């Protein structure tokens, strides 16, 4: 259990999630004076304490109530869950939300010159991985018997070093696999970063702060996914244009000076294919179309 009055959050000290976690807190208005030599940092403007730890330590810290919150990759979280379940250990936590960074996939990869016919090719193969529990679950579901070789780093070198016939490792772009003469053949798990909370209830003050942070995180993520669009539109095309621009709320419609046939339209939209959308807007008679990024948003 935590004894501090501060909300205690565990973050990855180094690695692929560290920078994104720090940036998320910054965008949420949490001001932290980071010191690379210290493993504990404090917010200047909120009662928040940050513990900077190894990523695979974060699930256990949350499960055991040492920290109140943790940001962790879903792959690490589920790997730890499966391991604890296999040992008959109790697991309790709350998953608050998936975050919009840390995207990757856990994949099987083989020598790039090897022919691949399907997952049955791995029968009785030696597979090197840092995620033995996720790999075992997948192979059990496929009915494939194999031998797992546990490596905690540099998994890609296992085939060339004669340690394994294949690997199961995290993939983002695939460049590391290619550089080591490997090719991706099966995706076994898709992952993003997520925010988790200890199962034991927090104090009213801490829970209120968690709720504030969740609202801000939602605003940051919505802003990143949305655009603020301003345009001039023919009045007789408003229905079609509104349907083309799915908004968070109804659009704002304003009259135009000296133009009774057209109006100004403002909308916050999550439309992604925007070049195609702009071309369609033009075909509908829209003009002066402006697309602006949104820094923060509370819907």
UniProtKB/Swiss-Prot annotation:
Q: Which PROSITE patterns match?
A: ATP_P_PHORIBOSYLTR (PS01316)
For biological process, the GO terms are: L-histidine biosynthetic process
Q: Which Gene Ontology terms of cellular component type are present?
A: cytoplasm
* InterPro entries in the cross-refs: ATP-PRT_HisG_long, ATP_PRibTrfase_cat, ATP_PRibTrfase_CS, ATP_PRibTrfase_HisG, HisG_C, N-reg_PII-like_a/b, N-reg_PII/ATP_PRibTrfase_C
Q: Name one GO molecular function term.
A: ATP binding
Family statement: Belongs to the ATP phosphoribosyltransferase family. Long subfamily.
Q: Which Gene3D superfamilies match?
A: 3.30.70.120, Periplasmic binding protein-like II
Task: Please give the CDD domains that the UniProt record associates with this protein.
Answer: PBP2_HisGL2 (cd13592)
Protein's gene: hisG
Pathway the protein acts in: Amino-acid biosynthesis; L-histidine biosynthesis; L-histidine from 5-phospho-alpha-D-ribose 1-diphosphate: step 1/9
UniProt keywords, alphabetically: Amino-acid biosynthesis, ATP-binding, Cytoplasm, Glycosyltransferase, Histidine biosynthesis, Magnesium, Metal-binding, Nucleotide-binding, Transferase
> Does the entry feature the keyword Transmembrane, yes or no?
no
The free-text function statement in the UniProt record for this protein reads: Catalyzes the condensation of ATP and 5-phosphoribose 1-diphosphate to form N'-(5'-phosphoribosyl)-ATP (PR-ATP). Has a crucial role in the pathway because the rate of histidine biosynthesis seems to be controlled primarily by regulation of HisG enzymatic activity.
Q: Where in the cell is it found?
A: Cytoplasm
Where does the record locate the signal sequence feature?
none
Q: Which reaction does it catalyse?
A: 1-(5-phospho-beta-D-ribosyl)-ATP + diphosphate = 5-phospho-alpha-D-ribose 1-diphosphate + ATP
- Protein name, as recorded: ATP phosphoribosyltransferase
- The protein's organism comes out as Actinobacillus pleuropneumoniae serotype 7 (strain AP76)
Report the EC code(s) recorded for this entry. 2.4.2.17
Q: Any known activators or inhibitors?
A: Feedback inhibited by histidine.
Q: Key word Membrane present in the record?
A: no
Q: Which cofactor does it need?
A: Mg(2+)
């Amino acid at each position: 259990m935590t004894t501090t009055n501060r909300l205690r959050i565990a973050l990855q000290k180094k690695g692929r999630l560290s920078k994104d976690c720090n940036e998320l807190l910054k965008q949420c208005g949490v001001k932290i004076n980071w010191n690379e030599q210290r493993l504990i940092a404090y917010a200047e403007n909120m009662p928040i304490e940050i513990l900077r730890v190894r990523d695979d330590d974060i699930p256990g810290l949350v499960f055991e109530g040492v920290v109140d919150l943790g940001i962790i990759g879903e792959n690490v979280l589920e790997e730890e869950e499966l391991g604890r379940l296999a040992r008959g250990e109790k697991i309790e936590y709350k998953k608050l939300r998936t975050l919009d960074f840390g995207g990757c996939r856990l994949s099987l990869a083989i020598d790039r010159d090897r022919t691949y016919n399907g997952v049955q090719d791995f029968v009785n193969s030696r597979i090197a991985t840092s995620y033995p529990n996720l790999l075992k679950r997948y192979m059990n579901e496929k009915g494939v018997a194999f031998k797992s070789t546990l490596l905690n780093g540099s998994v890609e070198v296992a085939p060339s070093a004669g340690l394994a016939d294949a690997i199961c490792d995290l993939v983002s772009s695939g460049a590391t696999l290619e550089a080591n003469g490997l090719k991706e053949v099966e995706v076994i798990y898709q992952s993003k970063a997520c925010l988790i909370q200890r199962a034991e209830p927090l104090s009213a003050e801490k829970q209120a702060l968690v709720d504030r942070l969740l609202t801000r995180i939602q605003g940051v993520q919505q802003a990143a996914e949305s655009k603020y669009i301003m345009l001039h539109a023919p009045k007789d095309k408003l229905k079609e244009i509104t349907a083309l621009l799915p908004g968070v709320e109804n659009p704002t419609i304003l009259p135009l000076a000296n133009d009774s046939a057209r109006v100004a339209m403002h909308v916050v939209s999550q439309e992604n294919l925007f070049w195609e959308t702009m071309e369609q807007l033009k075909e509908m008679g829209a003009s002066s179309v402006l697309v602006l990024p949104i820094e923060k948003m509370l819907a």
